[in-house]
């Protein structure tokens, strides 16, 4: 599995996930409209959502755009 890993909206940095990591995720604050920063990466399970945060998980290559 390969996931995107950069904080910008349009991302093309790809990371090959470790064995056992079967999920790509993207998380970001639902409050910031301008200058939104994304946290992207690989995970073994979908990260838990914090208050006022959006978390999206998927399981195909580069799906966390």
Curated annotation (Swiss-Prot):
UniProt-listed Pfam families: Toxin_cobra-type
Q: Which SUPFAM superfamilies match?
A: Snake toxin-like
Calcium is among the record's keywords: no
Domain of life of the organism encoding this protein: Eukaryota
Where does this polypeptide localize? Secreted
Describe tissue expression: Expressed by the venom gland.
Q: What does this protein do?
A: Binds with low affinity to muscular (alpha-1-beta-1-delta-epsilon/CHRNA1-CHRNB1-CHRND-CHRNE) and very low affinity to neuronal (alpha-7/CHRNA7) nicotinic acetylcholine receptor (nAChR).
Q: What is this protein called?
A: Weak neurotoxin 6
Q: What is the lineage of its organism?
A: Eukaryota, Metazoa, Chordata, Craniata, Vertebrata
């Amino acid at each position: 599995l390969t996931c995107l890993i950069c904080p910008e909206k349009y991302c093309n940095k790809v990371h090959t996930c470790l064995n056992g990591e079967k999920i790509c995720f993207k998380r970001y604050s639902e409050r910031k409209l301008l200058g939104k920063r994304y946290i992207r990466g690989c995970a073994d399970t979908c990260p838990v959502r914090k208050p006022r945060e959006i978390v999206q998980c998927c399981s195909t290559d580069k799906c966390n755009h």
